């Protein structure tokens, strides 16, 4: 499965709910990058040099790191990808990678949230936490980048019938319940097997 959603929609929180409820690992490209940098792997050193230069990590390197992570034992029974794929080239690569093992994606969970409500939420949080760098302008810019980058991917998965759109606003438990219900409608049940909310 994949999870996508705009910054501030609670993607990280819901990803951890999904992974604990369904017994699958949450595989975040950001976490993979940080772990490789921390462990000073060869790929991690390449990522660090690129990030330090202010550039985006190229698809080829990201693909290589994701391939390595998906080959680990805990991902054999399923996984939730967060932050990948980000480009159409990565979508193609992931298709080929999963296809080579006779696997395919079961669902792409999209947390849908009103942009103005997210901007208000993040602006308030930045103010409360004294994060001056998180101006409303910066928050709006990140929202625009998200829409620009992910719209083509979302359309690909919508056309394939994999997209599961869920209202991402509201209490954490309610959103988790919506996700669980939407997945159950596709025959994807949590470890409890009841199709009920995974709290």
Swiss-Prot record:
Pfam families linked to this entry: ADK (PF00406)
Task: Identify the enzyme class.
Answer: transferase
- Name the positions where ATP binds: 8-13, 125, 170
Q: Which InterPro entries match?
A: Adenylat/UMP-CMP_kin, Adenylat_kinase_CS, P-loop_NTPase
EC number, UniProt record: 2.7.4.3
Stored SUPFAM superfamilies: P-loop containing nucleoside triphosphate hydrolases (SSF52540)
GO MF annotation list: adenylate kinase activity; ATP binding
Any one GO BP annotation for this protein: AMP salvage
Subcellular localization, as worded in the UniProt entry: Cytoplasm
Similarity comment: family membership: Belongs to the adenylate kinase family.
Domain note for this entry? Consists of three domains, a large central CORE domain and two small peripheral domains, NMPbind and LID, which undergo movements during catalysis. The LID domain closes over the site of phosphoryl transfer upon ATP binding. Assembling and dissambling the active center during each catalytic cycle provides an effective means to prevent ATP hydrolysis.
The subunit structure is: Monomer.
Protein name, as recorded = Adenylate kinase
């Amino acid at each position: 499965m994949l999870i996508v959603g705009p910054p501030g929609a609670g993607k990280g929180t819901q990803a951890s709910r999904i992974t604990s409820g369904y017994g699958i690992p949450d595989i975040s490209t950001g976490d993979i990058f940080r772990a490789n940098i921390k462990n000073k792997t060869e790929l991690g050193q390449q990522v660090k040099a690129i990030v330090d230069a202010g550039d985006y990590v190229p698809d080829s390197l990201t693909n290589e790191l994701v391939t390595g992570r998906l080959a680990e034992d805990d991902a054999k029974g399923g996984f939730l990808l967060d932050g990948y794929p980000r480009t159409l080239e990565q979508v193609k690569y992931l298709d080929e990678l999963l296809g080579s093992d006779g696997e395919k994606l079961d669902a792409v969970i999209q947390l849908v949230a009103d942009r103005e409500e997210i901007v208000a939420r993040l602006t308030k949080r930045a103010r409360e936490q004294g994060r001056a760098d998180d101006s409303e302008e910066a928050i709006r810019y990140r929202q625009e980048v998200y829409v620009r980058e992910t719209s083509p991917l979302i359309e690909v998965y919508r056309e394939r019938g994999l997209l599961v759109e869920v209202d991402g606003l509201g209490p954490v438990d309610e959103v988790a319940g919506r996700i669980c219900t939407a997945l159950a409608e596709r025959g994807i049940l949590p470890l409890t097997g009841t199709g009920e909310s995974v709290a």
